[in-house]
């Protein structure tokens, strides 16, 4: 048998007959058309709109609007307070590699950000970090050190 356009047939069960609702009991979907006896879901003009709860205040109006959506690509930092630099020698150069080597930071996974919590007793530090808070920068520079921002 050759394959031609006039010899094509759909597979058995692939073409189902359209249900004709409300056309008599012999059709199987007569009278109530499969919508049950009474109630709002059996009436014409159905269905109710999405989110409608029968007149009760719907959930999407009961719950407050969401504010402050999270950032899609937030910046992650390894944060360190200036009080953690108290064990270093005067005039030392501080960067992420030296902090890992000294055991102050455990993992160099993210760039370093210096925070200004605590007191800085070490003098003349050269701190190389990706970001500084204003208080950290003022405390390091007040102790005679310099802040170098890395890219």
From Swiss-Prot:
PROSITE patterns: RIBOSOMAL_L15. Residues 1-57 are annotated as: Disordered. Keywords: Ribonucleoprotein, Ribosomal protein, RNA-binding, rRNA-binding. GO terms for biological process: translation. The keyword NADP does not apply. Residues 25-37 have a biased composition (Gly residues). GO terms for cellular component: cytosolic large ribosomal subunit. Residues 12-23 have a biased composition (Basic residues). The keyword Glycosyltransferase does not apply. SUPFAM superfamilies: Ribosomal proteins L15p and L18e. InterPro entries: Ribosomal_uL15, Ribosomal_uL15/eL18, Ribosomal_uL15/eL18_sf, Ribosomal_uL15_bac-type, Ribosomal_uL15_CS. It comes from the Bacteria. It holds the Pfam family Ribosomal_L27A. Gene3D superfamilies: 3.100.10.10. One of its GO terms (molecular function) is rRNA binding. Transmembrane segments: none annotated. Binds to the 23S rRNA. Part of the 50S ribosomal subunit. Belongs to the universal ribosomal protein uL15 family. This is Large ribosomal subunit protein uL15. It comes from Synechococcus sp. (strain CC9902). The gene is rplO.
